Amino acid sequence: NLFDACVEKAVNGFVNAGVPMEKLILGVPFYSRKWDGVKGAGCRNGLGMEAETVGGYGGDYGELKESWIGKRGFIRYWDEQAKVPYLFDGETFISYEDCESLGVKIAYLKEKDMGGIMFWEYKCDPSGELLSFIKKNM
């Protein structure tokens, strides 16, 4: 079910299929996903709302830091269920990873004794902020 995806369900699916926990690697993106034409935003700040587009690439972390986070009317919010930040300006929704969300994921994989973490892709973190965080906390 691609519409109810989450890390825990994926991990449990592999473990239930016989894959040892220490063989599982958690993948995280250094890029964002963006939806335009988000409708009926109201008090939910765009979270879970219908959009005019199916979503697509929203820029890498470096671009977000440079031009989007706290700029152009975008406000950073936190999705408590998914444990990730997102940006919303009343019409455009951008979901991404940052050091806070990486911290949650690193704590999870350590708790579960998973094999490690991987990211895609190196050039999407030109300042090295995310990579340095991973290195320091793994």
Please annotate each region the language model reported:
Residues 26, 109, 117:
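Conserved, mostly hydrophobic/aromatic
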Residues 2-39:
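Active-site region of glycoside hydrolase catalytic domains
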Residues 1, 91-95, 119:
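Second-shell loop/turn segments in exported
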Residues 15, 110-113:
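Non-catalytic positions within long, well-ordered alpha-helices that form the structural scaffold/packing
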Residues 28, 121-123:
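Active-site proximal loops enriched in glycine and acidic residues that flank catalytic Cys/His/Asp
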Residues 3-11, 98, 102-105, 130, ...:
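Stable alpha-helical elements in mature extracytoplasmic
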Residues 28-108, 137-138:
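Glycan-binding loop/region signatures in secreted carbohydrate-active enzymes
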Residues 108, 123-138:
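Aromatic-rich peripheral "rim/lid" segments of glycoside hydrolase catalytic domains that contact
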